[in-house]
């Protein structure tokens, strides 16, 4: 059987457009298993993001406050390359890395304007997971 050759077009690597955005939003999603930090411009376009799993933490170490701190620092450094100076923080979820991620954003030099908790709460919606027996 003859080998088929596929012609693949050479892809040009997409260049990162350096936006100059001084004010934006930091969205921190902190679940029981992971913490994701996304920093956006005021319209909601993501400039930089990082997660605890992406920082090299695996398993139960992803849910630690230290992993959330590392993720927030990495996302803040990426946003500062775009000229970010001030952020409004939106926190979602019940995880352990909420406060630590906010402190890490402040420690990297971003000025925190406001902090809002946007955790969705069910009005008797889905049945919660069964209780753990250890």
Swiss-Prot record:
GO biological process entries: translation
GO cellular component: ribonucleoprotein complex; ribosome
Keywords, sorted A to Z: Ribonucleoprotein, Ribosomal protein, RNA-binding, rRNA-binding
Family matches, as InterPro entries: Ribosomal_uS11, Ribosomal_uS11_bac-type, Ribosomal_uS11_CS, Ribosomal_uS11_sf
Entry coiled-coil feature ranges: none
Residue span of region Disordered: 1-22
GO molecular function: rRNA binding; structural constituent of ribosome
Keyword Transferase: no
SUPFAM superfamilies: Translational machinery components
Classification via Pfam families: Ribosomal_S11 (PF00411)
Compositionally biased residues, Basic residues: 9-18
Family: Belongs to the universal ribosomal protein uS11 family.
Subunit organization: Part of the 30S ribosomal subunit. Interacts with proteins S7 and S18. Binds to IF-3.
Function: Located on the platform of the 30S subunit, it bridges several disparate RNA helices of the 16S rRNA. Forms part of the Shine-Dalgarno cleft in the 70S ribosome.
Name of this protein: Small ribosomal subunit protein uS11
Annotated source species: Kocuria rhizophila (strain ATCC 9341 / DSM 348 / NBRC 103217 / DC2201)
Gene name of the encoded protein: rpsK
């Amino acid at each position: 059987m003859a080998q088929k050759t596929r012609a693949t077009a050479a892809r040009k690597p997409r260049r990162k457009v350096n936006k100059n955005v001084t004010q934006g939003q930091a969205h921190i999603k902190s679940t029981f298993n992971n913490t994701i930090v996304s920093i956006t411009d005021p319209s909601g376009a993501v400039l930089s993001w990082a997660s605890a799993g992406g920082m090299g933490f695996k398993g139960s170490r992803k849910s630690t406050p230290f992993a959330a701190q590392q993720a927030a620092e990495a996302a803040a450094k990426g946003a500062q390359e775009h000229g970010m100076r001030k952020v409004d923080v939106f926190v979602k979820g019940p995880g352990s890395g909420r406060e630590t991620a906010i402190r890490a954003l402040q420690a990297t030099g971003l000025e925190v304007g406001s902090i809002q908790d946007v955790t969705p709460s069910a009005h008797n919606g889905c049945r919660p997971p069964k209780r753990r027996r250890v």
